[in-house]
C-alpha cells in the first residue's frame, strides 16, 4: 500500500513526545523510505513572525497569516516545509504530492505570502518526520499508527488542537473508545 497522501494517526499508547496524539501527513512513501509532516504540534511562532524574521516583510503593506508555524517533526528542524494547494506559479523546489497538493522547500514561495500569487491554502512547518525503508510499515504492523486517506479540510482548515480527533472520526472512531480500551488493557 502506498501511504503517500494518507494520514497516520498515532495510537494512544504511542508515547514518543514527537508523535504522541499526532496526525502525520505522508508526503512521500517509496522504496527509499517515507517522509511526512506532523500536523498537530504548533510552535509559538506565527507565519507573520517567521516572515519578519526572514526579512520577507515588504513595504507594500502585505497581510500575513497569523496562523502558527507547526513543528513538522524531529528531523531537519532548521528547514522550512510549506504544504500547499496547487498554484499557477511554479516554485524552485516543489514536490507534487497529489494533483492538488504540493510540498515546497524553497523560500520563493514565502515571497508570495500576502499577495495574489500566494497559495489559496497552505501550512508552514519547521522540521519533518522521516522513516527508513520499511520502518513505517513495521510501525503500522505493530499498531503504533492507524492509516486513513488524507482529508483536505483536516489538513488546512481544522484547528490544530482538533486534528487528532477529526482524523479519528474519518475512521468512525471516537476518542472515548480509545480511553476505554486503554483502561481495559491496563486492568
From Swiss-Prot:
Pfam families reported for this sequence: DUF179
InterPro entries reported for this sequence: AlgH-like
Protein species of origin: Histophilus somni (strain 129Pt) (Haemophilus somnus)
Lineage: Bacteria, Pseudomonadati, Pseudomonadota, Gammaproteobacteria, Pasteurellales
Stated name of the protein: UPF0301 protein HS_0009
Family the entry assigns: Belongs to the UPF0301 (AlgH) family.
NCBIfam families assigned: PRK00228.1-1 (NF001266)
This protein's GO CC annotations: cytosol
Domain of life: Bacteria
Amino acid at each position: 500500500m502506498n501511504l503517500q497522501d494518507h494520514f497516520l494517526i498515532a495510537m494512544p499508547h504511542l508515547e514518543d513526545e514527537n508523535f504522541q496524539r499526532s496526525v502525520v501527513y505522508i508526503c512521500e512513501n517509496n522504496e527509499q523510505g517515507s517522509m511526512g509532516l506532523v500536523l498537530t504540534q504548533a510552535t509559538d511562532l506565527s507565519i507573520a513572525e517567521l516572515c519578519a524574521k526572514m526579512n520577507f516583510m515588504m513595504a507594500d503593506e502585505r497581510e500575513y497569516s497569523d496562523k502558527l508555524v507547526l513543528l513538522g517533526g524531529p528531523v531537519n528542524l532548521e528547514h522550512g516545509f510549506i504544504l500547499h494547494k496547487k498554484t499557477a506559479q511554479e516554485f524552485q523546489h516543489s514536490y507534487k504530492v497529489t494533483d492538488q497538493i504540493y510540498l515546497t522547500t524553497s523560500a520563493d514561495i514565502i515571497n508570495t505570502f500576502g499577495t495574489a500569487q500566494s497559495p489559496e491554502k497552505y501550512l508552514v512547518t519547521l522540521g519533518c518526520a522521516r522513516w527508513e525503508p520499511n520502518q513505517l510499515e513495521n510501525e503500522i504492523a505493530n499498531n503504533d499508527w492507524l492509516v486513513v486517506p488524507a482529508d483536505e479540510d483536516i489538513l488546512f482548515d481544522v484547528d490544530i488542537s482538533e486534528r487528532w480527533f477529526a482524523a479519528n472520526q474519518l475512521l468512525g472512531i471516537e476518542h472515548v473508545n480509545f480511553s476505554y480500551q486503554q483502561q481495559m488493557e491496563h486492568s
